Amino acid sequence: MNLKDHIRGIPDFPKPGILFYDISTLIRHADAWQVAMGRLAKVVRAHHPDLLAGVESRGFILAAPLALKLGCGFIMLRKRGKLPGATVGYDYDLEYGQDRIEIQADAVQPGQRVVVVDDLLATGGTMAAGIKLLRKVGAEVPAAAALIELAFLKGRDRLDVPFEALVSYDQ
């Protein structure tokens, strides 16, 4: 099955000049979603994770059921102020400013293997920050994965772990 047939491009969203790749058209078709999850499971299983870290917010849609399928735990990488209790964060640069990604302070035990999962890799800034945050708390990060990669933005170049995507767009 060609997963690209189930992903729609929406021009000028969220702002003019951006082509948004919408996974909602894939996940609402059970067969396409099953195929995507099966392929992601094969990619991620090879790294023997203890936990999957889903990147806010569409990464949760993939990482949570994938963790269940693989028999490992799931944690959330969230924007500042979205998690209850004590948190640990990592500040990172955006094109015009800064942002912060956080996890709950007790989410990861030192030495646990955590694979980062998101719906899409664009410039790689958020995923790279998530990897750094996980290492900050003592996690081992053997890999990262996404459903979609915008290869022309070269986001994988910002990652210092193996990265795999199921679908790649060159423009």
Curated annotation (Swiss-Prot):
One family name in Pfam for this protein: Pribosyltran
Which GO BP terms apply? adenine salvage; AMP salvage; purine ribonucleoside salvage
Q: What is its EC number?
A: 2.4.2.7
Pathway terms, separated by semicolons: Purine metabolism; AMP biosynthesis via salvage pathway; AMP from adenine: step 1/1
Annotated membrane-spanning segments are: none
Lineage top rank: taxon: Bacteria
UniProt-recorded Gene Ontology molecular function terms: adenine binding; adenine phosphoribosyltransferase activity; AMP binding
Q: Which UniProt keywords apply?
A: Cytoplasm, Glycosyltransferase, Purine salvage, Transferase
Q: What class of enzyme is it?
A: transferase
The record's section on InterPro entries has: Ade_phspho_trans, PRibTrfase_dom, PRTase-like, UPRTase/APRTase
Q: Name one GO cellular component term.
A: cytoplasm
Q: Which Gene3D superfamilies match?
A: 3.40.50.2020
Localization terms from the record? Cytoplasm
- Catalytic activity, reaction form: AMP + diphosphate = 5-phospho-alpha-D-ribose 1-diphosphate + adenine
What function does the entry list?
Catalyzes a salvage reaction resulting in the formation of AMP, that is energically less costly than de novo synthesis.
Oligomeric state and partners? Answer: Homodimer.
Give the protein family. Belongs to the purine/pyrimidine phosphoribosyltransferase family.
Q: What is this protein called?
A: Adenine phosphoribosyltransferase
Q: Which organism is it from?
A: Acidiphilium cryptum (strain JF-5)
Q: What is the lineage of its organism?
A: Bacteria, Pseudomonadati, Pseudomonadota, Alphaproteobacteria, Acetobacterales
